[in-house]
Structure formats: structure tokens, C-alpha cells
């Protein structure tokens, strides 16, 4: 049975997801992990650091293994989320698509209606732009598929024309904070507020002649009534060489969902095909999210230096993970802390050696194996992870064994040794808790003690 998921459903889901960040029922954390290189020959689909593997959406990878090499997690505030749309910078010499309500429909000739860029739906077409001042405009008409050479800059309610023959409609502007927090190379914030209360639904702002017809009486026919289920629409039709040569909207009308003109009103032309373009429900700029296809959610998270000690700056990371409602192992309840440590740790006594990041550690008596994240000499604290791979977390018997007791721990690279006094084998973020909603593998991101990493996630619905 042919079926589709509509854009309204996608936008509804995006809105609900974005709203959930402000609701008490849910908490979201962005975690970073995978300090070890991808090319470790431990698994199929292992990829490389220069070409990270695509995550696999299976029970093992999502429900279990993704937690094994997490380092730290930071809570995402609702103010750090927004709806976004693909970013399309205006550039001179580019031919933009125009807004059309019926891309993908079949026309009277039996062909699919496509945009100039060959898109078969509105949201894949290039029908809006952001200018150099971060003002967003919808293209109402592209002057017969010609190149745009005049940047739109007029911020007014009415549709306006530029010197290159294009017609534009102002939608909204990105404030300074929105530019700083929700503007990336590929996506940009989309306004959830109406920017024009003067528009009306079902207005006809554009018209295209796809077939001029024949056998008509030449002349200019003014105040031609636009028929359909709306009211008030008028146009001027010019018939030359016995065919329709141009149509100009003189009154946009209101309430249309379909429209046409009578042949008898335009010189009895036979076979003319005139496409009237219907504005969105409520009119242009009334629901900007729906009009521009805002079914993407961006989260914007900054990892500032060590985040009061929870985040490591001596190691790199290759994975970001979005987790909903993880458990805080200290409280055994849904986590609410601003940051969570995802590693295990050992505190040593005496004068231990200096362990180094990314080395294997072992404990001969227990057979435990771990992978060093960092070592703090002042507190004699070593943080480590135990991924389910040999030489990283699995012992020679194929078992993940906990470090325990006071027997010596040895570093394979540094040859450092230390006598444990305490073990914390339960990370603050309880492994295998909550729901992992998003996993992204990246090229290595190297951290530094004076550095802030900004991570933007895009979730598409």
C-alpha cells in the first residue's frame, strides 16, 4: 500500500523533541568517548581515524558497547537547543528555485513538476536564502530561471523585487546569539515566531505559464477573475500570436487551495496551461518552521576546559553520544548533575610512577586489564576504561575483570607501578542506563587544558 510520512508529522516530531529538553520528565546528556584509535583491529567495520566507521544500530552497539569507552557527559539545557534548517547562503550568479506549493505533483502533460534544481519536493529545492547580514528570504519568483545577481536586503512585510528581476519575501533575521550558538556550516536557526501578521492564507503571489495554447484572440485582458475556492484574485493575461504570452497577478486574493481562469475570459485560448502558485496556510512568514521545513533539531554544547575536573584534557575523543535519562550511580536515580564522569578510577598510595594516557594497565593478581585515560599526580588518581577488547579491557581469558585490592598495577608503556588504596569501578554515569538516541563517529578531536570544544549535533526527523 503506497504511503508517506508527511512533512507535518516530521515537523511535529522535531518540535516535540525540542520541547522535551525543557520538560521535567526527561534529561539529556551529550557524552564524548572513544579515546582509542579506530584502527585497532578489534572488530569488523572498524574504520580508521581518517575514515571513521558508520555506527551500527543494533542491540550490542547501542545498548551495551557504546558505554564502554565513554569519558564524560554534560547535561544539555533547553536553551542549548533549537529547530534548524539547511543553511543556504545567497551567492551572486546562482539560479535559485522559487516557492511552489505543488512540487512533485503531476501536471496536465503527465510530467512531474520539478524545480529548476530538479527537486521534486519543496524542501529539497533552493527556494530560500540567508544574506550576508543573516536575514532570511523566500524566493517568490526567479525571473524565468535566471541567475540572481542582486542580494535581497529589504526587511519589509510586502513582497519586493530586486534589480535582477527576482521577487523575495522577508522571513526573519538571526540575532547575534543565534548566529553564535545555532549557525554552522550546513545548518541555521529557524524562527518559531511569525514575522508577518499581515499576510493571509491562500493568496496567489506567483503564476507560471507552462503552455500558451492556441487559437485565442490577441489582446490584453485585465481584471480577469481567478476562479477556485478562494476569493478576490485578479490577474492580467496577455494573448499574443493567438497564445497566452504572460500572466500578471494584480490582486492576490485569499483562501485559495486551487485556482484557474476561464478560457472565455482570456480570448478563448485553447489548450493553455496556467499554474497559479498558492501561498502556504496562513500566508508566507506566518509559520516559518513549517514553510521552510524545520524538521531538524540542533543541540549546541560547549566543553569548557576540564568542566571542574569531570572532563579530561590529556586525551582525544572520536565519538559523541546523545543519551536520554541516564542513571546517576551515586543517587541511583535519573541523572540531573551538570556533568558526569563516565570512567573508572584507582587512587594509589606512596609514590607511584607516572602513568601515561592510552597505555594498557594490568594487575597481575586479578588479571584485570584497563586503558588509561589520564593520571593526576597530585591526587595520585588514575582514570581508565575497560572496553570489551583485548589489551584494553579484556584479560587473557577473554573476561572483563575488575581491578581490586592492593596488588600492584603496572603500566605497559610507562612501566609505572602503583599500589592501590581505593577503587571506584562504578562510573557516575551508570553504564547501560538510559536511551542512546544518537551516535556519531568523528575524526580525533584533541583537547587542551585551555581549550573549549563546541559540539553541534543535528537530529533529522
Region locations from a protein language model:
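Conserved, function-critical positions that sit in or immediately flank catalytic
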Residues: 161-461
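Extended assembly-interface regions of large multimeric machines
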Residues: 1-147, 155-192, 309-345, 353, ...
